[in-house]
Structures are given as structure tokens and as C-alpha cells.
Amino acid sequence: MVHIHRQSKSATVNPLKSSQPLGAALAFLGVDGAIPLFHGSQGCTSFALVLCVRHFKETIPLQTTAMDELATVLGGAAHLEEAILNLKKRANPRLIGICTTALVETRSEDFARQIANIKMTHAEELAGTEVVLANTPDFDGALEEGWARAVAAMIQQITLRRQQAPRSRKATLIERITKPSEQPWKQQKVAILPGWHLTVGDIEQLREMVEGFGLRPVIVPDVSGSLDGTVPDRWMPTAYGGTSIEDIQELGRAVRCIAIGEHMRRPAELLQTLTGVPYVLVQSLTGLKNVDQFVSLLSEISCVPAPAKIHRHRSQLQDALLDGHFHFAGKKIAIATEPDQLYQFATFFTGLGAEIISAVTTTGESEIIEKVPAEKVQIGDLGDLEDLAGGADLLVTHSHGRQAAERLGIPLLRIGFPIFDRLGSQHKLTVLYRGTRDLIFEAANIIQANQPAPSLEQIDAMRKRRNAG
């Protein structure tokens, strides 16, 4: 059983985690025509904006209510109203996603009531724009909680409720024996709730696989449509591409919901409660066994076998496992990231024969931590990782871990958010057959490149010992 060690320091050394509002903003950016709005000071928004721009290398439409000292003391309802109306007038977004910060959450204002009053007072002016509130205080949780809360807020406040009529046994039997191509298209819709740790490339690959089974994936949020680096024909003041508001409204028409990552359990449960759509939680899509189970799930939903292309990708992964497993046996790995991504990579490396000697994460609220294949998990920062990673063969974390890697003399595999000292990080594959294959090659190459070649003297000594034996 893994031992979870809570942080006992009074200060954070080289922070590991990003805040809840940032996670919520990333989720809102996966909706077409959206603008995330930080309800807080300009500094909070500027810091998050810098991280997003450096990671994605794109313009990010992140806005703020610009709370000052007076508004912080007397209340920020006027600032919130002014910001919403200004955004509607200047950008006409389809969605304004409000992310609260610690500055306003500490005052304990009733934001839901304030937004309801704004919507009622300015109903005509705000027509055609959804205003969604996600409570995301900086002092609680981390990036993955913010992402999940934003997705749950969109489902709660946008998705249409649906009272499902009980289906007869005869109707159920007909659905099972009818070919998917003969069933109504709306019955082939599958809602997919990806976790924050899936990259743009991961979501594109995920969509291709689901479509390969004749299903229609509705991905919420879909950052592969908005943060994939495409250049629009004209300047866009909002998120360009992503999930449409109409698709979020019609999530209740899906035959199944697939949530990826433990932190997406609550949004999936909420969707099931509101619409009756049953959900399946997939804790990881990395590794041969996990992907096999996912492919079997898609085959069960669609009633069709896996396409030949998927079998070929699986065969490529098997070959990569044969080629790469020699480089991982007995290797010591140190990982620091959010809980679900920690589980994803820890199980990936231990499946290759490596050992997790140091596991550091941002928050102890997730149940997935108890399943991490390590002796202990430290809730802490990159300073804790540096203290615990002595003797490791590979350090696995985001770009802020590069200084620790240099001081320890350990190679660094960059994952998560932010990655600002490498290009194309958003297109990196980490899931399904091809993503697992690419991770094996990348990690093995990093380990190989940092293993010194034996000198001539060492080779001669080995030959002498062999001949003497």
C-alpha cells in the first residue's frame, strides 16, 4: 500500500503545481468561441497568460475583471458585470467562462446570484452568449481540479436535461442485433470527457480511433480544435475551434460517456445524473493493457471489430516493447506531476520493469494516488523532488524541473504543463498505441544518450575478466 506524505513545510520551493483558475481556463479554451474570464486582479491573469502563451506558442484570449483594492473590500459585482458586458460588446463570444480566484473567493461573495442578476438584467444584451461560473480558488486544489470543475460547470449550466423513457426489452434486443450503420446517427454519439493531461495530439488521435469504429465522438472540452496551432484567416478575439455550444447542449443524446482520468469522474457522474447517459471511467490510456481494454470498450459500444489500422498500431507497439524494454529494466525513475498524470506515467514505467523511487504530486485529494505503484507519494513541490530523486536514472516532470535535473546531473523527460523550452509539446503523443510507442522511444533514447560509453581501459578490463573466467 502506498504511503501518502502530506507537505509539512511552511514555504514552497520551486512550485510544481499550477492553480485551479488556470486549469479551468484551459478547459474553457476548448470550446469554440469562448473567452475565459478571471475574476480577480490583473496580476493573477497575467501570470496564467504568460504560462499559456509560452506553452502553446499561441495568442490566448484570457481576460480579467481587474479587481482593485476598493472593489476587493466593497465587493466585485460591479467589476464582474462591467467585464461581462464589455466582452459581449467587443468580442461577442459564444461562451464567457468565469474562473474565480483566491482574491474574491476569500470574501465569500455569492457569485452565482450575482451572475443570475446580470443575466436577468441584461437578458437582451447577452442573448447568444452563455455565461458559465466555475468556483476555482487558488488556495485549494490544483490544475486538474480546476479543469474538472470547469467541465462540470459547463455540463451543469449548459447541457439540456433529458428524461429518458424506459426502453422495452424488445427495443434493447433490436438495438443489439442492428448494425451500427443502420442505427440512427444520434444513437452513435459518444461523449468523451478528456482529462487535462491529454495533449492536443492525444485528443486528435483519440478522435480518429473512435471514428474508426463508426462512432461520433463529442469531446468536451476539445483543445485539439482550438489550441492546435492553426492560423485563422482573420484575427479572432475568442477561442478558435473546439467543442460547439450546441454539442454541449446535446450531450444527453450520447449512448455512452467515456471519462479519462479520475478527476473527470465528477463531471461524468453529473452528466449521468442530469441526462441518464451511463459513463465509463478510464484511468489511463497509456500502456498495452489499458489501450486493449479501451479498444474492447469501443468495439462493445459500436458492435464492430477493431479496424485493421488499429491492429497495425498495436503490432508497432509490441515491437517497440521488444526493442525498448532492455533499457528500462532496473532503472530508477523520479516523477513529479498532477495525480492522474503521475498514475499514468508511473504505471507506464513500472510496466517496462523500471522502479519509481520518487513520486511527488500537487494535491492529496485524488483517490488515484492510492493506486500509484510506488512506496510513497509526497504531496509537495519540485524542491521535494530534488531531495528525493538522488540516484535516479530519469527525472520526469515539466519544464520547471530543468534546474533540479541540471543540479542532480539526471536527464529530464518533459511532460505536463508548462513545457516552454521545447517546441511542439502540444502535439506530443502520450496515449493509445502510438502514444505509448513514442513514449518508449523518447524515454529510452534519453536514457541511452546519458549513459557514458565504456572507455578502452574498461573494455580491456572486462575482456581480461572474461578470459580469466
Swiss-Prot record:
GO terms for biological process: nitrogen fixation; protein-containing complex assembly. CDD domains: Nitrogenase_NifN_1. Pathway: Cofactor biosynthesis; Fe-Mo cofactor biosynthesis. GO terms for molecular function: metal ion binding; nitrogenase activity. Keywords: Metal-binding, Nitrogen fixation, Plasmid. The keyword Metal-binding applies. Pfam families: Oxidored_nitro. [7Fe-Mo-9S-C-homocitryl] cluster binds at residue 44. The keyword Transmembrane does not apply. Belongs to the NifD/NifK/NifE/NifN family. This protein may play a role in the biosynthesis of the prosthetic group of nitrogenase (FeMo cofactor). This is Nitrogenase iron-molybdenum cofactor biosynthesis protein NifN.
